[in-house]
């Protein structure tokens, strides 16, 4: 009987020590859409991870007559003095790509999408959108 109580107590202590405090729980993933242009579908997400943020940007070339699609996200500090960027391209109808960035700049996130011609010139670009 004492052995059972000792095992139960040890199990309870192990479980209590193994759980994370509420402050260490992962924050939710926030999805966003990037304003599109003809033939381009773009989207992304961000998630706070402690003192940093993980930004993911995805793009899909969705039209046969669009040669390539691109999307970019810029994460700034609160004063717009420093930034990190993540960009992604997809070439060919139906192709999709995603890229991620972990940055310490938590102030603002701005995203934009564009489509391009075969010669590398920009065909159309969306209006930049402030996510936060």
Task: Report each predicted region and the residues it spans.
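N-terminal prepro-regions of secreted/extracellular proteins
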Residues: 1-41
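Post-signal peptide N-terminal regions of Sec-secreted extracellular proteins
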Residues: 25-132
């Amino acid at each position: 009987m004492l052995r059972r109580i000792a095992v139960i107590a040890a199990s309870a202590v192990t479980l209590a020590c193994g759980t994370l405090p509420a402050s260490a729980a992962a924050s939710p993933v926030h999805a966003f859409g990037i304003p599109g242009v003809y033939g381009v579908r773009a989207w992304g997400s961000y998630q706070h991870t402690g003192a940093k943020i993980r930004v993911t940007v995805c793009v899909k070339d969705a039209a046969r007559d669009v040669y390539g699609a691109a999307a970019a996200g810029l994460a700034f500090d609160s004063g717009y003095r420093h930034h990190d960027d993540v960009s992604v391209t997809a070439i060919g109808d139906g192709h999709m790509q995603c890229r991620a960035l972990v940055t310490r700049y938590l102030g603002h996130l701005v995203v934009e999408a564009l489509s391009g011609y075969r010669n590398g010139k920009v065909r159309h670009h969306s209006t930049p959108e402030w996510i936060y």
